[in-house]
Amino acid sequence: MTTGRTAQRRRGPGRPPADAPLPDLEEILQRGLEAFAELGYEAVSVRQLNERLGMGHTFIHDRYGSKEAFWQAVMESAIRHVTDEVTAALDTEQPVDDLARLTASVRAFHQAAARRPHLTRVINYEAGRDSPRLAYLYTLMSPLNDAARPVFDRLVHEGTLRDIPWYLFHFAVTKPLAMYSQAPLARLFGRPDDADDHTLLSTLVLNGLLT
């Protein structure tokens, strides 16, 4: 007779119990995002990833083929969610009101980032290294950049926004997100864990960009 203890030994390391509920794809990708954010791409092993996902030790190899392919799937999913939310905000406002569209998109971007601090941590980590992974991230960001850039250009041309380069606008909008991705430091400065301050942050950023 096979005992429960024997069955547990035979499952092997990293393999979930046979009757354990499997996470859905969104949960798998979210757990992967958290693992890459907390441990770093180079430091985390495939075995650690599978354990963090709650899957068997061959899951990533069987489903994605490699750690790199899994990382790409994780980042594609996370950035797509942000892109969809910000693009929807852009499209909600009247096409002729560029200022309202830009304001709505910045607010939506900060709100989306506040809910996804692990995404910002991964991007910050990769942004300091000239690598194929950074090039891949930039490609994923391109649809949102392509949608927002014409609005930015028109507002600069008409004098509503300060006459600044596009790259400066990008960093002015994105770098304050450290408040969400660096939660332990923000906590030391007195930011409550349940703070709902993304709207205030957006207002401060926009006020600094408007003429």
Annotate the PLM regions.
Residues 1-23, 34:
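N-terminal intrinsically disordered/low-complexity leader segments
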Residues 23, 27, 31, 35-69, ...:
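Helix-turn-helix
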Residues 31-35, 112, 176:
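Short amphipathic alpha-helical elements of helix-turn-helix/winged-helix folds
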Residues 73, 87-118, 169-173:
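Hydrophobic alpha-helical connector segments
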Residues 76-82:
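Short, basic, alpha-helical segments at the C-terminal edge of helix-turn-helix-like DNA-binding modules
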Residues 106-109, 123-126, 173, 177, ...:
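Short alpha-helical scaffolding segments that buttress acidic/His motifs in well-ordered protein cores
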Residues 111-149, 153, 167:
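Short secondary-structure transition hinges
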Residues 134-135, 142, 156-202:
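Hydrophobic/aromatic-rich alpha-helical bundle segments in the mid-to-C-terminal region
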